[in-house]
């Protein structure tokens, strides 16, 4: 599935193509997992990746700054196995360039988000999906 042209923010999807936005529809709102530009050692160029708090410290920083300049809502994803060292099994590497497999990375990345928000004069608020929906449908 090609999501490259999909909005990187909550949107009302078109009936003919759910990946593109149509006029505001109070009946349906899509909350995509947000992507930011990232680059790690094995990447030739920057790539859009889902915002994952289990990434190594610093991987998200530049992309998040760009994202927060244009967006108010961030939807991230983290899988439980990505923060447990025992799940990293690669005989060729001592560490993974992208995923940390450490719980501390979640804290580090959240702290980076808080620092960035303060620098950009943004408020941080953790919301339930129902709160986000009411915010977007009552604009």
Name every feature range the model reports, one short phrase each.
Residues 1-72:
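Active-site-adjacent pocket scaffolds in enzyme catalytic domains
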Residues 50-139:
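C-terminal domain-boundary segment and adjacent tail
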